[in-house]
Amino acid sequence: MYDLAILWDWIAFSVRWLHVITAMAWIGASFYFIALDLMLKPNDALPKGASGEEWEVHGGGFYHTVKYLVAPSEMPEHLTWHKWQSYTTWLSGAALLMIIYWVGGELFLLDPTKVDLALWQGIVISAGSLTIGWLLYDAMCKSRLADTPTLLMLLLFAILVIMSWGYNQIFTGRAALLHLGAFTATIMTANVFFQIMPNQRIVVADLKAGRTPDAKYGKIAKVRSTHNNYLTLPVVFLMLANHYPLSFGTQYSWIIAALIFLTGVTIRHYFNTMHKTGKGPHWTWGVTVLLMIIIAWLSTQRSGDTYEDALARELTAYEERYASAAGFEDAYNTVIGNCSMCHAREPVWNNMQWAPKGVLLETEGDVARYARQIYLHAGVSRAMPPPNAIQMDSEARAIIIAWYRAAND
């Protein structure tokens, strides 16, 4: 069992690596085509149906790009489709969600201080919210709201705020922000998979058959692509947020997430305008800085259970498994002596305001809850505690290893 813990952690690391790589490819391609589209310049010498061109230089070579409003008069034999960057990002993200927040849900997904849920119930809420969210958004885009893009965007923002609040009522702070990111990314990838790509195939098929494509497909793609454009930066923030307790360790984390979506709008508006006109509106940076100042202030408002509340809380079945294992008392004392100066509700380490990654190791319930992470980081490896903070000897690490293995025999 203990070997499986190490293997499982490496699987999670590998999938996370894949997710970051594919996300870089997707976001890079998305930003490139948005910038390219906005920088296109008209030219009377262009072929019929072409709306603009752009010359670029990169890596010692020159590139000449021509955009057609619908399509060229004759389709080329080879056509590159930009879709798998999006698909693999979502698929790897979904796999990572399952590995960390479903399989490891007793620790990372559920917060017993908020609601009393079985793990399977949390997983159903996790998966169901992503599915229902897409269906609701898709229905809105297919309604008359599509004729008023600004109103549609505002309603999308309202949905994101509601989901942010809802996730924070059920899940841990880390899981709440991660799920909001997954919710948003699901909308973005589903836009590509269910709308943009199928409609593009219809256009290509019409052209090959000699038919004039319906302009409505371009309109649909523009609405969905615009949403994806403004949602990209907040999704990246939400991907990174689980590494920074200041973003999720407060009762106002759902408001922080909402404000991050607004910063995504202001930043993208600047670059969209700059690519189109050559000069971006500088006021957007002032608004962005103001929003980040508000976010920083909100992050200082502490929340969560107190030390007394944590002591009084009844252990979950998962925690009881480790708290009742042989060697727990020695392991608990070892963790308290080596880790709790930082991993406390009020850390005593100089200039530390929050426990690293939000991991609290003060009570017996805390230590039992994070048993697997303690085993991996302070038992079989020397990742924790930092050597410049405290020197943890091999005997202390052996105590942790023996306790964890005893609980899993």
Predicted regions and their residues:
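Composition- and surface-driven signal marking solvent-exposed, interaction-prone regions
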Residues: 29-30, 250-254, 277-285
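Pore-lining and gate-forming transmembrane alpha-helices of multi-pass membrane transport proteins
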Residues: 181-186, 252-264, 284, 288-289
